[in-house]
Structure formats: C-alpha cells, structure tokens
C-alpha cells in the first residue's frame, strides 16, 4: 500500500524523530509498501501539500514532541481524511499534558506519584513538595527539561528563573528505585523492560535515552512475576483509560523496598528505532521490527 511517513518536526525531539522515521521507512519498504517520506517543518501548508501530492492510503506518524504527538498533526490528518498510526486527537492531547494524564489515571485507580501542576511563580517562591522531588515540563517528552531537586539542594529558584517550558511545571515526589517500561500493541501488553542508566547518568534523561552507551535495556525485566503482571496490567489499563490506539508505552518507577510501582507517563508516540524500547519488547514477543511497522499501518487502516 501507499504509505506516507511523517518525520522530523519542529520540536526539541526532531533528531529522535528523524532516526525513528528513517528506520520505519526502511522497514515498510522491506515489507513491500510504497513509501513517501515527508519531513515536517514549521509551515503546515507545505506538509498538507506534500500529503495531498503523495495521496497515501495511510500515514505512519513518526513525529515526537509538540505538534507531532499532542493532537495537532492528528487534527490535520483527520481533516484530510487520512488514516494514521498511533493515537487520535484526544488521547494524544491528553497524554502530552502530564497534568491531565495524572488526573485521568488516578480517577481510574491507577497509581501516580504525589504531585501537582504549579506555576513558575509558585516554584520560584518555595518548595512545592518536600525534597526530593522532580520538576517536569507539562508538555515535553524524552525527559527534556526534567530536573531533580534533592534534600539540601538550592537550585529550585534558579530552575524557576531559567524555566523555558511555559508558565507551568509538573512537580512530583521522587520515587527511588528502578525505571521500568511496558509497551502495548492494540489490546496486548508486550513485556516489561528494566532501564539501567549508565553510572554517569543521574537518571534516565535525554542523554541516557539517546546517547550511545547512555543506558542498558534488560527485557524481560528481572522482577517477581507479580510485579511484572502488575506493570503489564497497568500499562494496558493506562492505554485504555486515555483512549490510545495502535501502540503506546507506559513508563514506571518501582521501589523494591516498599513494593511501590507508580506510572510516570504514557507515551502515545514511543521511539521507533529498531533498538528502541517498544520494538525491543515486540522482538522479545516474536514480532520483528518490519512486522511491527507493518502491523501499525494495517491496524490504522482497519479502524
């Protein structure tokens, strides 16, 4: 079939999207599809013209970050009447808003860390939570802008002064322990991965995610079966609660000392290089990377 692959974009995650998109293009061509790459820039009219010229049967969305996974490009594709992979407008917009995601997940009985959305002015005045706590942009991905304020740390006011991610921030209690993630394909939770940042990484930040040697992935995670089952259940329920479609990935923190497992976020546009977390989990389940990409476009077309 004719597939247009959207990649690039204008967010801070553009380099990640380019890698994901190029890998998907190669995989889809391997599966026999007629693929047209479309590098999405700041001019949406140019993107629309490229989509109309390509006249695809389906669009593979390999964009990340604002405008790519927040419902914006999804709205354009809906307006054009083009089927597309991953989640729709509402789920994409909600999942991109970490504050809104927290509210919906908690209402569904799913575990989230103690926290709230604060203004930058509030953050500048006083600690919003007892340290240690995490400060996150409300609408960024790939751990862009994430800061950890630890006990005795005097960086809070400076973080607020130099904040460049809007007028608000999400603050959450820091959960010690392990970084876990679980992917979902349709109505199936795949596997749980244990993410081990390098010894030089403070946490699983942008460099740990994308720099060579920045982290190591262990799939399946070496966990008690009950914890694995809980993570898989939470990932599928989070996918369903937000109304996600296609593939998603839910990230967790797990404190072994207290047996506490909390959801950090739900990714409606998970990384899609062959060595990204979701494709690794699919491979563990016997689904090759080309088969995963092929499933995504066929699932989108069948909705």
From Swiss-Prot:
Pathway: Cell wall biogenesis; peptidoglycan biosynthesis. This is D-alanine--D-alanine ligase. ATP binds at residues 128-181. Mg(2+) 2 binds at residues 265, 267. It comes from Gluconobacter oxydans (strain 621H). The gene is ddl. Keywords: ATP-binding, Cell shape, Cell wall biogenesis/degradation, Cytoplasm, Ligase, Magnesium, Manganese, Metal-binding, Nucleotide-binding, Peptidoglycan synthesis. It is an enzyme of class 6 (ligase). Its EC number is 6.3.2.4. Gene3D superfamilies: 3.40.50.20, ATP-grasp fold, A domain, ATP-grasp fold, B domain. Cell wall formation. GO terms for biological process: cell wall organization; peptidoglycan biosynthetic process; regulation of cell shape. The keyword tRNA-binding does not apply. It is found in: Cytoplasm. It holds the Pfam family Dala_Dala_lig_N.
């Amino acid at each position: 079939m004719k597939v247009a692959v959207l990649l690039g974009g204008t967010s801070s995650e553009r380099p990640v999207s380019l890698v994901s998109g190029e890998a998907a293009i190669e995989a889809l061509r391997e599966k026999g599809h007629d693929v047209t790459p479309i590098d999405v820039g700041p001019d949406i009219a140019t993107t629309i013209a490229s989509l109309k010229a390509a006249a695809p049967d389906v669009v593979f969305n390999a964009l990340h970050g604002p405008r790519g996974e927040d419902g914006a490009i999804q709205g354009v594709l809906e307006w054009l009447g083009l089927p597309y992979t991953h989640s729709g407008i509402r789920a994409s917009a909600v999942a991109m808003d970490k504050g809104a995601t927290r509210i919906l997940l908690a209402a569904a009985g799913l575990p989230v860390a103690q926290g709230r959305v604060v203004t930058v002015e509030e953050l500048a005045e006083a600690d919003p939570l007892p340290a240690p706590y995490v400060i996150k942009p409300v609408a960024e991905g790939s751990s862009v802008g994430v800061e950890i304020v630890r006990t005795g740390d005097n960086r809070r006011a400076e973080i607020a002064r130099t904040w460049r991610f809007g007028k608000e921030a999400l603050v959450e209690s820091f959960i010690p322990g392990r970084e876990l993630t679980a992917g979902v394909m349709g109505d199936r939770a795949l596997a749980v991965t244990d993410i081990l940042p390098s010894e030089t990484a403070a946490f699983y930040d942008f460099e740990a995610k994308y720099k060579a040697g920045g982290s190591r992935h262990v799939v399946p995670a070496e966990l008690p079966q009950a914890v694995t089952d809980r993570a898989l259940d939470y990932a599928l329920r989070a996918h369903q609660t937000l109304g996600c479609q296609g593939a998603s990935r839910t990230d967790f923190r797990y404190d072994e000392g207290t047996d506490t497992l909390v959801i950090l976020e739900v990714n409606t546009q998970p990384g899609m290089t062959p060595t990204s977390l979701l494709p690794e989990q699919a491979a563990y389940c016997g689904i090759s990377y080309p088969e995963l990409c092929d499933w995504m476009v066929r699932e989108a077309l069948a909705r």
